[in-house]
A protein has these predicted regions:
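Extended, charged catalytic domains and RNA/DNA-binding interfaces, predominantly
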Residues: 29-708
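Gram-negative bacterial Sec-dependent N-terminal signal peptides
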Residues: 1-28
Length: 708
């Protein structure tokens, strides 16, 4: 909001609200407003890849694209565990930019015409150049500099050595070069399951820190707990031990490698001979993190629906009991999941085939969070601190080069998906530090948005002042939310709680839910300005690079308390079972242009009353650019449909949403001369945001035990 009078009015309204709230029905949030440090929302990404695993770019170039080209405020680089032959610390060779070089080509048939030959895999096109060169050929002493087991030629370097000796120093230098927190994590191939995004910050010194740090603990974690790391050297000169103090599972540790392993199963994963061994090892990993770095670590299962339901004799999938086990073992370490995967521009969106748990993605989100009443709602219904995150999972742009804006695989970090995280000031940590970001992720005070469908959010639940009319309560709290959005902050008023917090209220109190979002004006990062083909079906002409928020759903459910592991029927089971469901979850309210207030700078404010609250509960938000009943995209209630509805599995048949504009690019699914929404066009057409929950605990009711 640029109007000075408007800002003054909002500030006065917020001050009036503070006075009004002083006589509110007694309630508390996570902290009193006067003692809770102020903060701001900052955006970042913690799951992406370089040539040190299966990515296409060097460390330096990926960092630059993420924090410079796409302006992320923070960045965690997280390659896979295991080993790699390629040296990702080597920069790309100098080259003449390959057309279109950050632009789009022109031809007689439209701005994306097929007359240009693109280099396969991007720049560098040769596998023998830049970061595609091997460690063996680029280290001073060749193979002698590569530690641990292995006889391949060229010899592969174990990920622990890459992290400790090569990648960390580069990332520390990049962090200080860009004056932003940049540090190293790991997408671990977790035993018994598929992949998990992790970090251990202890030892690392990203900007604004100074001095020479280290990633020794991160490297040790990879050696100890990645199922693709079958090295037995104990980290060579490090002589690491992977035991957890006092754990009965230390009896499973192999005496040579000093990690949980079996003969013929050095990764310690599930197998027919060792069912569930992998999951046991993954729980030990969480416990080890909690012992070694309880305040500077996280363990966030990635694209967890992708590999299908859990199999005790294989390494795939996560059922709800595994998430509960992780959270029970260390709630400060395992506090959420990436149910919105990366790879959003792939034909099978997110890389989710029909064998994924739930059968695919729904508006780009996996079934665990994308379907109301499912796994996420079941966890929130226990009152757990289990939060929603997303990532780019950047590897490459498919058949396009890194400097081309089209993609039929991945988006760069910050190009399409952003995690917006509250980072607080003070507490001796400065304004923006890696520690503050990890604290923010752990707090649950965060939200995710694709395609900048929104770029700011304030979401708060307050007890109403019984001395004021309800409409006056709502107006005041809406003003406070709008003021918070204008300042990229949150509402900080006694008697209110925001995302990741709980409000404790007396039974019978009225609650006010207030939301303010900013639908940013102007263009997002989409390279396409032709009309959104999904909306064109219903007669709406809206450029793909100028999306507009259509509606916001307020979703809620009851909190009924933690389920005991002994209650197997309610604790364990795949998607769709009672254990993985919360039947109380539903849409409480839909906000759109008919009932929200449109303000300056794209700000939309809205509110909802919960009269005479009786039961402990939670509320969360989602929103989209697509109206309810958009064919092949949303149902009559506005829920996202399976992404296979728009783009069928069989790639040889026509899609269901035609792209008839002359500017529709040639790489789209094309059958009988007709182009159909697919790849990046489908992703830019179908945008969603998700907030994390606000909890309400009713006095003498069910405790929201997982949230302070």
């Amino acid at each position: 909001m640029s109007n000075q009078n408007t800002l003054r009015d909002v500030a006065l309204a917020a001050a009036a609200l503070c006075a009004a709230m002083s006589v509110i029905v007694p309630a508390v949030a996570a902290e009193k407003a006067a003692t809770k440090p102020a903060g701001t929302y900052v955006s970042g990404d913690f799951h992406n890849h370089t040539t040190c695993s299966d990515g296409a770019l060097s460390l330096q170039r990926l960092v630059d694209r993420s924090v410079n080209a796409y302006s992320l405020d923070w960045f965690v680089q997280a390659d896979h565990g295991g080993s790699s032959a390629r040296n990702c610390t080597l920069r790309e060779d100098p080259f003449e930019p390959v057309a279109p070089a950050l632009g789009l080509t022109n031809s007689a048939t439209g701005p994306y015409g097929g007359t240009v030959t693109y280099p396969s895999g991007g720049q560098p096109a040769s596998t023998g150049k830049g970061p595609n060169q091997s460690w063996q050929s680029t280290l001073p002493n060749g193979v002698a500099d590569i530690k641990g087991d292995g006889t391949a030629n060229p010899k592969r370097m174990w990920r622990w050595q890459e992290i400790k000796e090569f990648q960390y120093p580069v990332l520390e230098a990049e962090s200080r070069k860009h004056n932003k927190p940049v540090w190293i994590g790991l997408e671990t191939n977790n035993p018994g399951h598929e992949h998990t995004s992790t970090t251990i910050l202890t030892g690392q010194l990203p900007w604004p820190k100074t001095g020479a740090g280290n990633a020794n603990l991160m490297a040790q974690f990879e050696y100890c707990f990645d199922r693709s790391d079958t090295d037995t050297s104990r980290g060579a000169e490090n002589q690491w031990d992977c035991s957890v103090s006092g754990s009965p599972n230390n009896s499973l540790i192999d005496p040579v490698s000093r990690k949980i392993a079996k003969a013929g199963n050095l990764g310690g994963g599930n197998s027919a001979a060792n069912p569930d061994l992998g999951h046991i090892k993954s729980v030990e990993a969480v416990k080890w993190m909690n012992e070694k770095a309880p305040n500077t670590s996280f363990y966030v299962p990635a694209h967890l629906e992708r590999a299908g339901v859990y199999n005790p004799t294989a390494n795939r999938g996560f059922n709800i009991e595994h998430l509960r086990n992780f959270n029970n073992a260390a709630p400060r370490i395992a506090f959420g999941f990436e149910s919105m995967p990366g790879h959003q521009a792939q034909e099978d969106r997110g890389g989710y085939g029909t064998g994924a748990a739930g059968g695919g993605t729904f508006g780009g989100t996996g079934a665990y969070a994308g379907l109301i009443g499912g796994v996420w709602d079941a966890l929130l219904g226990e009152g757990r601190n289990w939060f929603f995150f997303a990532s780019s999972d950047y590897h490459n742009r498919g058949s396009f080069g890194a400097d081309q804006r089209e993609t039929n695989s991945d988006f760069f970090p910050g190009e399409y998906t952003k995690d917006h995280v509250m980072v607080r000031k003070g507490k001796g940590k400065g304004d923006l530090t890696a520690e503050g970001i990890i604290d923010g992720l752990r707090s649950g005070n965060s939200y995710v948005a694709n395609g900048d469908v929104i770029d700011r959010l304030s979401f708060v639940v307050c007890t109403a002042n019984p001395g004021l009319p309800i409409k006056a309560n709502q107006a005041l709290i809406e003003k406070a939310a709008a003021n918070a959005v204008a300042n990229k902050g949150e509402v900080r008023i006694d008697g209110c709680a925001t995302m990741g917090e709980k409000l404790v209220a007396r039974p019978g109190a009225d609650l006010i839910v207030a939301v303010a979002v900013r639908d940013p004006q102007g263009k997002n990062n989409s390279p396409y300005s032709f009309p959104n083909p999904s909306l064109k079906q219903i007669g709406v002409t809206q450029p793909l690079d100028k999306p507009e928020l259509d509606h916001v759903d307020l979703i809620g459910g009851l909190v009924t308390g933690y389920v005991s592991p002994a209650d197997t029927a309610r604790y364990a089971g795949p998607i769709g079972t009672d254990a993985a469901s919360n039947k109380s979850a539903k849409i409480l309210k839909v906000f759109n242009k008919t009932n929200w207030t449109a303000g300056n700078d794209g700000v939309r404010t809205m509110s909802y009353r919960v009269p005479a609250v009786k039961a402990s509960q939670y509320m969360r938000l989602r929103g989209t650019n697509l109206p309810a009943a958009t064919p092949f995209e949303t149902d009559a209630q506005g829920n996202p449909l399976s992404d296979w509805e728009a783009s069928p599995v069989d790639q040889t048949v026509k899609g269901n949403i035609a792209c008839a504009d002359a500017a529709c690019p040639p790489h789209m699914r094309t059958v009988a001369g007709v182009k159909y929404s697919s790849f990046d066009v489908a992703a830019w057409s179908d945008l969603w945001f998700y907030s994390n929950p606000v909890f309400v605990e009713v006095i003498n009711g069910v405790k929201v035990a997982g949230v302070k």
